[in-house]
From Swiss-Prot:
It catalyses: L-citrulline + L-aspartate + ATP = 2-(N(omega)-L-arginino)succinate + AMP + diphosphate + H(+). GO terms for cellular component: cytoplasm. Gene3D superfamilies: Argininosuccinate synthetase, chain A, domain 2, HUPs, Single helix bin. The lineage of its organism: Bacteria, Bacillati, Actinomycetota, Rubrobacteria, Rubrobacterales. This is Argininosuccinate synthase. Pathway: Amino-acid biosynthesis; L-arginine biosynthesis; L-arginine from L-ornithine and carbamoyl phosphate: step 2/3. The gene is argG. Its main location: cytoplasm. Belongs to the argininosuccinate synthase family. Type 1 subfamily. The keyword Electron transport does not apply.
Amino acid sequence: MLGGKKVVLAYSGGLDTSVCLKWFEEQGAEPYALYLDLGQGEPAEDVREKALRIGAREVFVWDAREEFARDYVAPAIKANALYGGRYPLFTALGRPLIAKKLVEAARRVGATHIAHGSTGKGNDQVRFDVTTGSLAPDLTVVAPVRDWNMNRPEEIEYARKHGIPVPVTKESPYSVDQNLWGRSIEAGPLEDPEHEPTPDVFELTAEPEEAPDEPRYVEIGFERGLPTSLDGEKLPLVELIDRLNAIAGEHGVGRVDMIEDRLVGIKSREIYEAPAALVIIQAHRELESLTLTKDVLRFKPAVEQRFAELTYDGLWFTPLKSALDAFVEETQRTVTGSVRLKLYKGSSTVAGRSAPRALYSKDLATYDPESTFDESAAAGFIALWGLPARRWATVNPDPSQAPQPASRR
């Protein structure tokens, strides 16, 4: 079926995609590999050499960190995007960009097929397939691990049989995905929800009890909803995230252990490390509480939840997602200021916040005599505010609350 066909594979250098690359070669296809640097921290040249050794005709290594931060992470920050209220969606945010670049690479080499290493149980298969269909419906998507129905131990054996070096063993069978915005760890003993992750699972975050005994204060500056400075120093978003990952991670901040509802209908146990993402979203929410009206603050979480669901479900390039983007962007016009946080042994606590267009006014809020709040207006306000309730009670009296006749003795 694939004999002589050009196929561009989203290549990570890990077990799944390395097995796919060899499989394509065995099928007589002309496999090309695309490695997209989203901040994984792996030497790109090592990945290139590995793909060529396995059988890739050509390997594209593209640095997409700035595009990822600008076009995918930035909207997620403004939307406080957390799936299930906890997962900052770093993998889900990266997939539409990878699919977009796969299409570009396919056009460059004249490929008719693009491929990924997703399994049939995961969410990524949906994200890759749906995004490709949205951008290039003429291309055929191939997913060998899913279609082949090979389990992880079988993949490891296949890799060993074909001399494919992989960082996964039967003794350490973790599946890891990482980019600028976070790191996920799953599979192996982590599939038991009662199993506590051992220290070897984590790379970005220190064990909280072993973190420094002195707290670290950081100040994040925002302009129109986006972080632009760290401790007073203006930084590009990519560099700011990198620095904050290191700082917060050193203090054990940024771990998530959750049961997650996957798009395919099953629950999974997920371990995440996202020091910068969780701290930035925490700070951003705090600044919004200072600069947005009560009505916006009440309504925006519903938009944020739907934004997170669309991202998680692979519906990034859809009309609804674009409409939500427009709403969120409008809310961010005044979200400028700074938030100071205290990082200490796994916790991140807001220690202060300020904004040039803050809606908070100490003169109005203070209980001191110099308060400018006109308390004499309160009685009239309460009378009007409670009028509908009083009118309802008058027309529809509650018998249990009716006056009782005085008892006679």
